[in-house]
Amino acid sequence: MFYDQAKIYVKGGDGGAGAVAFRREKYVPEGGPSGGDGGRGGKVIFIADEGLRTLVDFRYKRHYKADRGEHGQGKNMHGKSGEDMSVRIPVGTVVKDADTGEILADLIEHGQKVVVANGGRGGRGNARFMSNTNKAPTVAENGEPGEERNLLLELKLLADVGLVGFPNVGKSTIISRISAAKPKIADYHFTTLVPNLGVVELEDGESFVVADIPGLIEGAHTGAGLGHEFLRHTERTRLILHVLDIAGSEERDPLEDFQIIAEELRQYSQELANRPILIVANKMDIPGAEENLQRLTEKLGEDYRIFPVSAATGEGLKELVYAAAKALPEIPAPQIFVRDEEQHKLTQASAPHRFELTREGDFFVVSGKEVEKHVQMTMFDREDGLYRFQNILKAMGIERALLDEGIKVGDKVRIAGIEFEWEE
């Protein structure tokens, strides 16, 4: 089975907690703080590997979690960072956030890497909190939780040329003739249910990769007949060979077939519909082909190059292959995804809302990535930790927002699942 989609969960390692410790030193209160920082959590990293062909491995393992950082220790000893987790995926995989649909990466080269989940930073030890007014702090931080997200992986085959058309028009026979690919061939619809790749080698030493895309039907752009799964693999091709049963042996009109598939490509992606196309008029060895070829040429000959061929006898295939090879250098490779790193950073930095305040029954509920991170990193079992958290709420404007909403002594506040009681 050819697995070209997978949904998985990834999580970076949590940061290690900072330590509360004091060294023994004469004339220094409590010996002076010496708690080290926690180590950073490991990252989850995807690496493109040309040796992998499908996403089948992700069918059996769906959760990937990097190691957490070690906790800090006394004597200003920092915790060791967690080990990164490297996950190999096939070249040609597009990585999406499954919850938002955002494209995170498009891995098209062997060895290309992308971090899909960062590890959390280590919590600061109490040595970091010493100041002129607090010579012996007893506060430290928990480690920051690692990033976590659900990912959708989509494998889009890397091919220069894509063979498209209705089922049973001869695409598999053509690819078996012009390359070493050995697809399953039979005289019934949907013989090909997975894409086949073949390398076409020319006499002058040049070569290109061709993909036999499983047969499309009307409504493919809506998913009919596994259309979405099949059309996905045409997105990377630079040149499309639209194969027609020019003899009409399936009692279909080849001109109408061309128009239907062209419309399916347009409905799926306008950029795909604009891709250069060569028309392959196959089955020229069957009676009725000449008449249909003449009619097709009259209708489409001015806009498209038409190549009459017979996959059964091999007639016309050499001319087709060399025409494709000649056209390819002039056609730029399509780009599925280009990430503007600077723009991405600016977007992240300019988030308009630092927190949100709502009411749920008797609770005031405060939510937001920043404040929730502070909750997770605060050691509430230490008085200094609670005092510091109160100062954070004040600095972020949360205290003022709660007062404006009419909070009173004894009211309940919930942040990141933890409940607090409001006091003066």
Curated annotation (Swiss-Prot):
Belongs to the TRAFAC class OBG-HflX-like GTPase superfamily. OBG GTPase family. It is found in: Cytoplasm. Gene3D superfamilies: GTP-binding protein OBG, C-terminal domain (3.30.300.350), GTP1/OBG domain (2.70.210.12), P-loop containing nucleotide triphosphate hydrolases (3.40.50.300). This is GTPase Obg. Keywords: Cytoplasm, GTP-binding, Hydrolase, Magnesium, Metal-binding, Nucleotide-binding. Mg(2+) binds at S172, T192. It holds the Pfam family DUF1967. GTP binds at residues 165-172, 190-194, 212-215, 282-285, 310-312. Monomer.
